[in-house]
Amino acid sequence: MKKQYRLRKNWEFDLVLKNKKFIANKYVIVYYKKASAFKVGITVPKKFANSVGRNYHKRQMKAIVHKMNLYNYPYEMVIIIRKNFINCNFLTKVIEIEKIFTQFKQQNEKIK
């Protein structure tokens, strides 16, 4: 995933989180807000793993989002990874993230 599609600054994350719109399952929480372009930020709490482990799971999540090709959706998103995400295999992660994003797409088509 290219840098132009990432949320980087703390205040960017705060703006999305303050919007309070989210979708959750037992693996991730996805906060979102309407924006002019697609951007995503990924967080893993410190207590789940050391820095190497946290970066590993962030890379996996970036790969899943890149594979799903969500770049034409005008939303900013913050994805918070839960403990269950860390303990499952990659195939389960892909399936569960695809489910949550199809749920997100259906929910936002109703709004339009």
Swiss-Prot record:
Assigned EC number: 3.1.26.5
Cited InterPro entries: Ribosomal_Su5_D2-typ_SF (IPR020568), Ribsml_uS5_D2-typ_fold_subgr (IPR014721), RNase_P (IPR000100)
GO MF terms held by the record: 3'-tRNA processing endoribonuclease activity; ribonuclease P activity; tRNA binding
Key words, A-Z: Endonuclease, Hydrolase, Nuclease, RNA-binding, tRNA processing
Superkingdom of source: Bacteria
Record's catalysed reaction(s): Endonucleolytic cleavage of RNA, removing 5'-extranucleotides from tRNA precursor
Pfam families, A to Z: Ribonuclease_P
Family of the protein in this entry: Belongs to the RnpA family.
Assembly with partners or alone: Consists of a catalytic RNA component (M1 or rnpB) and a protein subunit.
Biological role: RNaseP catalyzes the removal of the 5'-leader sequence from pre-tRNA to produce the mature 5'-terminus. It can also cleave other RNA substrates such as 4.5S RNA. The protein component plays an auxiliary but essential role in vivo by binding to the 5'-leader sequence and broadening the substrate specificity of the ribozyme.
Identification of the protein by name: Ribonuclease P protein component
Organism listed in the record: Mycoplasmopsis synoviae (strain 53) (Mycoplasma synoviae)
